[in-house]
Design a protein with these regions (language model features):
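FIC/Doc superfamily catalytic core
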Residues: 1-177, 181-301
Length: 301
């Protein structure tokens, strides 16, 4: 569960972003396309794809494919990008089982056609580490229940709902393959339905933040850690979009700190905590070059 200060910050940033999004509809689409390689790279890398960000850009942007890559990984990049683009061009009003199956079919086409677009059934058990997915006999029913619960719950805080959905989806593990990528894709679709930007779960921090949050849910049936992670990533995503839509010049946080006589480690810590409007691009912290805010004294660190 996140505190009220964090909720207020998200609400304020969300309101600002939605106003900008109405004014800059075409820019929003272009920003999403520009962020596509990082979204695809990180989501696939979490599943142990060996493609680098540069490889992913070559495949998606330049249509260049090196011969030393496995064909499966090339399709994984292209198919995930296709699924994201489908959602961009075909906005949905609510999550449905039919949408989930369509996205899965897109994701696994030419990779595992025999299971693409259908839930596990019969004797199709699945294990991830020590976790065993739900009994295949009950997967279909569990998924309809999960979708119905998400769509009908109008009282719970939206990030709590999204985090619970994601954690339970991964706990059920409804597919024979592609569960993590579909789960993260659905999280961003749920945010988009609320007029919010996509989040990027960094591959580099999966062992420190993402996996422990999922493990907590498996052990306690509570998704608080995942809510906190999603809140942090959403704030960063809002900073990214708002800054790109409004800033005259965007520079590395390292340069910003130097220009303002601020200790670099102090500035970096503030960026990580989200107390300055910084965001990552290709793993590097960036910020509006003209940003100044007396509310946060960076020198106190």
């Amino acid at each position: 569960m996140i505190n009220q200060v964090t909720r207020d910050r998200i609400n304020s940033l969300s309101e600002e972003y939605r106003k900008l999004a109405i004014k800059h509809k075409e820019a929003i689409k272009e920003l999403t396309i520009s962020e596509l390689p990082e979204m695809v790279y990180n989501s696939n890398a979490i599943e142990n794809s060996t493609l680098t960000l540069e490889d992913t850009e070559d495949i998606l942007i330049r249509n260049q494919i090196r011969t030393d890559h496995e064909i499966r990984e090339i399709y994984e990049a292209k198919n995930l990008a296709s699924a994201i683009e489908y959602l961009m061009n075909n906005p949905e009003k609510e999550i449905s089982v039919e949408l989930i199956l369509k996205l899965h079919k897109t994701l696994l086409t030419n990779i595992r056609d025999e299971i693409a677009g259908r839930f596990r059934s019969g004797k199709e058990w699945v294990r991830v580490g020590t976790h065993i997915g739900a009994n295949p006999e009950f997967v279909n029913g569990f998924m309809y229940e999960l979708v119905e619960k998400y769509n009908s719950d109008t009282d719970e805080y939206f990030l709590d709902k999204i985090a619970y959905f994601h954690a339970e989806f991964e706990n059920i593990h409804p597919f024979g393959d592609g569960n993590g990528r579909i789960g993260r894709l659905l999280t961003n679709e749920q945010l988009d339905m609320l007029g919010l930007p996509p989040i990027i779960i960094p591959n580099k921090s999966k062992f420190d933040e993402y996996y422990p949050a999922l493990d907590e849910y498996t052990k306690t049936n509570k998704a608080d850690k995942l809510t906190e992670l999603f809140a942090s990533l959403l704030i960063e995503a809002l900073y990214r979009r708002i800054t790109k839509l409004t800033a005259k010049k965007i520079i590395p946080v390292a340069d910003w700190a130097k220009n303002n006589g601020i200790n670099l480690q102090s500035a970096t810590n503030k960026a990580i905590r989200g107390t300055i409007p910084a965001f990552r691009v290709r793993g590097h912290w960036m910020i509006d070059g003209e940003y100044i805010d007396a509310r946060w004294s960076l020198l106190e660190d």
